[in-house]
């Protein structure tokens, strides 16, 4: 969803209302094209079939885990870190959906999955998928956690004022805090606020939407090496011979 801007006009319209509840409850002062909350709103407004037959909104990882455990739509869940990845629609410190925000977004509360702790056991591996995977049936399955949230643990960023620079699909700089910071949550800073995996952990992050994707674009469209994963090694070797400062060349993804 980093490059999916289908919600751009809706984001601009919603942002024009300057709802203070966004920053107060989520730490995010305004809507963003990347927020799943905006994609959910888009589906509610543009997909008649979904409005008629849809039961729950789910992220891909919880959806896979729910299927492995043989859960029904009524058992749909989301961990509290991934919940905060919605961007809007929840109370981040309480780890609960926000009735007021969801009403503004036009998303029915009953379509939201229940919020779990990342280490909660949501079920066990079903007989069907035990055969598919070659694993033993009955293995406990926990709710899991969001990718960036887990990256912060992997980097050791779990205490306020610690930070990490992450170069992935989306280039990110993250800094841990002890909660919502009014100064950092000002709209002009364009930062995103999330709950971490562990209890009472939070972080802000700034980003470039096409950080790592820009490398693939360069390989495919400039070097004409589409699909050649090994070509990145060749680019790395060539980059080693470039002097610091890249001779004044600046690339903006």
PLM features: what roles do these ranges have?
Residues 1-16, 49, 71, 175-253:
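Glycine/Thr-rich phosphate-binding loops that ligate phosphate moieties of nucleotide
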């Amino acid at each position: 969803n980093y490059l999916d801007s289908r919600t751009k006009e809706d984001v601009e319209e919603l942002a024009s209302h300057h709802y203070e509840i966004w920053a107060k409850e989520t730490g995010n002062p305004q809507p963003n094209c990347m927020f799943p909350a905006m994609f959910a709103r888009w589906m509610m407004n543009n997909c008649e079939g979904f409005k008629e037959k849809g039961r729950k909104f789910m992220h891909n990882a919880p959806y896979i885990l729910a299927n492995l455990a043989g859960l029904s739509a009524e058992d749909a869940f989301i961990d509290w870190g991934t919940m905060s990845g919605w961007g809007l629609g929840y109370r981040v410190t309480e780890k609960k959906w926000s009735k007021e925000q969801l009403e503004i977004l036009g998303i029915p509360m009953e379509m939201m999955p229940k919020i779990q702790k990342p280490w909660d056991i949501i079920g066990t591996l079903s007989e069907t998928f035990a055969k598919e995977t070659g694993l033993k049936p009955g293995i406990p399955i926990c709710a899991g956690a969001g990718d960036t949230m887990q990256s912060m643990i992997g980097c050791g960023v779990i205490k306020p004022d610690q930070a990490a620079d992450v170069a992935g699909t989306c280039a990110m700089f993250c800094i841990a805090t002890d909660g919502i910071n009014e100064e950092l949550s000002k709209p002009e800073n364009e930062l995103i606020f999330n709950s971490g995996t562990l209890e009472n952990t939070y972080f802000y992050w700034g980003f470039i939407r096409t950080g790592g994707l820009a490398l693939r674009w360069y390989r495919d469209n400039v070097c004409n090496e589409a699909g050649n994963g090994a070509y990145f090694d060749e680019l790395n070797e060539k980059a080693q011979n470039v002097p610091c400062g890249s001779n004044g060349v600046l690339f903006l993804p």
